[in-house]
Amino acid sequence: MLFRSWFLERVHVMKRGTGFRRRGASATVLWSDITGINVNEGNQGTSNLLSTFTNLKAADLAHALHSLTLKRRVEVARALEDERLADVLQEMDENDRVELLTELDRERAADVIGEMEPDDAADLLREVGKDKAKALLDLMEPEDAEDVQRLMKYEDYSAGGMMTTEPIVLSADSTVAEALAFIRQAEIAPGLASQVYVCRQPLETPTGKFVGVVHFQKLLREPPATLLGQIVDKESATLQPDADINTVSSMLASYNLLSMPVIDENDRLIGVVTVDDVLDHLLPENWRHKDDMRVR
């Protein structure tokens, strides 16, 4: 006899009828789009849970894991690839991700942190305590650890503490076509894709002298062969690394920007603060678990 595994992908749903109507409107929807249903983990093994979670976005998977017991949560986390688990940890609240990270062996935890965005990794290491943070940093790839340590020296709610160190940085003799090619990369977050940063060599943060920015919309209006140095905005607003969150949020709102460059005392670009970085710090700690705040 041949046994097959069945996985739920779509469900037919119907609204409850009102008045004399026996049936309400109906539709067929993806199971991954259904919210408000708790997973009954008692009847599911880890492999079945993983199959259920395959197509979930990282934020939705983090929400689903929150409803599981710690034991089952750890089982799922151990089965996820490093990059996938890193994405999920970035979407968890402080208590959940610290608890989960503590259950992983240190080598695996260090590998996962190395896959996180540097600013999120710095936030997580601040949360686990100095001793454990040092142990994990020692196990990380030196280049990854250096980026994270650079961020950890800033206050959590400052521009330096919230910034990412991996914006799109190009030289003045790069072309519009080259800039758009970077922006098209799937892994570039929307906030970072909103503009490119023009600097002198070196182009990795901390860069050479910061020149200015070119907004994505400007790139779309210019011929592909145009040099960035010809269209760069040299009067763009910038932030100091010690700027507090109120200053950062006010400037983003005032200039209607999705991101802003952070410049040190030597006029070097050291990072970029995005709107989502600021929102993560402004929203209540438990906002991720409020069902009425989730997109439906």
Region annotations inferred by a language model:
Residues M1-R296:
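Hydrophobic packing positions in regular secondary-structure scaffolds
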